C-alpha cells in the first residue's frame, strides 16, 4: 500500500538541508545517511548518497530514473550466498 497523495512524499529534514546546502555551494561530496525511508527528490540528482544497509554505508549515485523511489531500495540489506549444491554429483 502506497502513501496517501494528500500527504505528499516524505524526506527527512536533515537530509534535505544537507542537499540544499550542497546545491547552493555547488559542491559534490558524499552524504552519509541512515534514512532509508526518504523519497528521492529531483534536487538529489547528481549527488552521491551513502545509504546505511545495517553493516556499512553503500554509496548510491542518484540519477533521474531514481526520482520518486526510496533510498533504501538501492542499498540491499541481505547478501545472497547461493543455494546449496546438488549432492547427486558428489555421490557418483
Swiss-Prot record:
InterPro entries linked: Ribosomal_uS19, Ribosomal_uS19_bac-type, Ribosomal_uS19_CS, Ribosomal_uS19_SF
GO annotation, biological process: ribosomal small subunit assembly; translation
Stored Pfam families: Ribosomal_S19 (PF00203)
The species this protein was found in: Geobacillus sp. (strain WCH70)
GO cellular component assignments: cytoplasm; small ribosomal subunit
GO MF: rRNA binding; structural constituent of ribosome
Name recorded for this polypeptide: Small ribosomal subunit protein uS19
Function: Protein S19 forms a complex with S13 that binds strongly to the 16S ribosomal RNA.
Keywords from the UniProt entry: Ribonucleoprotein, Ribosomal protein, RNA-binding, rRNA-binding
Disulfide bonds: none
Stated family: Belongs to the universal ribosomal protein uS19 family.
Signal sequence range: none
Keyword Ribosomal protein listed: yes
Amino acid at each position: 500500500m502506497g502513501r496517501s497523495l494528500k500527504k505528499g512524499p516524505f524526506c527527512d529534514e536533515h537530509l534535505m538541508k544537507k542537499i540544499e546546502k550542497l546545491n547552493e555551494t555547488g559542491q559534490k561530496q558524499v552524504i552519509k545517511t541512515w534514512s532509508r525511508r526518504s523519497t528521492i527528490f529531483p534536487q538529489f540528482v547528481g549527488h552521491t548518497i551513502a545509504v546505511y544497509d545495517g553493516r556499512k554505508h553503500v554509496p548510491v549515485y542518484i540519477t533521474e530514473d531514481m526520482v520518486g523511489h526510496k533510498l533504501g531500495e538501492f542499498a540491499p540489506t541481505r547478501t545472497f550466498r547461493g543455494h546449496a549444491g546438488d549432492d547427486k554429483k558428489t555421490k557418483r
